[in-house]
Amino acid sequence: LAAADKKANRIAAEGAIAIATVGDATAMVEVNAETDFVAKNEKFVTFANTIAEIAAKENPADLEALMAMEYPGFGGTVEDKRKDMILVIGENINVRRFARMEGACSSYIHDKGRIGVIVKFTEPASCGKFVAMQVASMAPKYLDRTQVPAEDVEKETEIIVAQIKNDPKNANKPENIIKERMVPGKLEKFYAANCLVDQEYFIDDSKTVGKFVASEGSARIVEFVRYERGEGIQKREDNFAAEVASMIK
């Protein structure tokens, strides 16, 4: 295990997103490795899928609780199995995060685990897979505009006002015209880009996602979660020239 601990500080920003459904629960987990090559390893893929199944079945309170759960057929915990995987594969491996939802959920994995999405509906939705694909491709931040924090709207408004005032064409525009007529239209574009139900549907841009879902039946979107592999993790930058230079000194 000391060998596994030595690798703990190495950056692991590759890996895969895995999703599993057990009963009426769907869980998604991000498991990171150091290289894309290892992320395609069959043992690594099985490890990620098994953890997603454990999360769906056992409903752990948090990541620490998930790591303390028994890993089936191993004789140890998920954390024990993680350390064993490091020794077997030879790279740092981290279980970074997980999400779990119960009820009528649809899910989607894009590009062999690069992006994963779970969308929960009020009831089973025939359009669920398409909505999950929308979330994967268009990366909305919010479900609808009621979920956008007031400070985000305020910040966006400040940016819009600054952009308008910096445009020479608007040099003589009165303040009230800018705020009452120009800002609202640009805020609508912000909502259309960031709120799932207001986004243009990626298959038919003549309708929003909200209108598409409404046209498909009585199911409505309750919430969604989107993971992208390695997002927010500082990637290791290999400087090949410097590496070669250091070898010949």
Task: List the predicted regions and their residue ranges.
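N-terminal assembly/interaction segments in proteins that build large macromolecular machines
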Residues: L1-K249
